[in-house]
Amino acid sequence: MAVLLPLFLLSFMFTYSNAAVCVCKDANELDLQKVIDFACGGGADCAQIQTTGACYQPNTLKNHCDVAVNSYYQKKASTGATCDFNGAAVISTSPPSTTSSCLSSSSSNGTPTAGYPSTGNSTTASPGTTNPSTGNSTNSTLPTNDKPTSSTITFPDSTTMGPSSSTSGDPNGGEELSVRTTTIILLTTIAAVALRV
C-alpha cells in the first residue's frame, strides 16, 4: 500500500497536462487573414505578432494565425468559446515547433490589442499613401479604434467566421483527454499493485 501513493502522484505528474492549444488549419492566405482579423478584433493579444513582437517570426500568415487564434481561444474559452473559427482552427496537443514557444495554454496577462500583422499586401496607412514594404499604393484605413467595424466576417459564400457555439469543439482545451489518460493509468497501476498482493 505504501507504493500506491507515490505511483498515484507520479501518474498525475507525468500525464496531466493542460497543454492543448488552438491552431489554424492549413488554408489559403485570404482565409487565414480573415481568421487573424476576427481573432485580433475580438480580443486576442495580437501585439505579439507585430513586427516588434516576440512572435512575429516566422513571418508567415499561418504562424500569425496560430498565435492569434490561440490567444483568442485562451482568453474566451472560459466564457464558452470553442476553437473552431468556422472550421478554420482545431485543438492540438502538439503545436507546430515554429510557434510552440508563442502558444501558451493559458491566456496572457497583457491588455488585448487589435494590431494586425503585415502580410506585404495590407497596410494601415492613410489614404493615398504608399505601403513601404511593397511599394504598392493603398487607399485603406482602419477605423479610429484600430478594430474591425464588425465582429462577424462574411466569406464570399455567405458563411460567417467566429467561434462555433456548437458542442463539437472542446471548451476545456483538451483537459478531458488528459483526465481520461490519467484515470486509465491510475486504474492500471491499482490493478497491477492489487495483483502483486
UniProtKB/Swiss-Prot annotation:
Identify this protein by name: Carbohydrate-binding X8 domain-containing protein
Origin organism is Arabidopsis thaliana (Mouse-ear cress)
Origin: domain of life = Eukaryota
Question: Which keywords does the record carry?
Answer: Cell membrane, Glycoprotein, GPI-anchor, Lipoprotein, Membrane, Signal
Q: Which residue intervals are annotated with compositional bias (Polar residues) in the record?
A: 116-125, 146-155
Query: Which cysteines are cross-linked by disulfides?
Result: none
Cellular location(s):
Cell membrane
Question: Where is the stretch described as Disordered?
Answer: 101-176
**What does UniProt list as this organism's lineage?**
Eukaryota, Viridiplantae, Streptophyta, Embryophyta, Tracheophyta
User: Which residues are modified by lipidation (GPI-anchor amidated asparagine)?
Assistant: 172
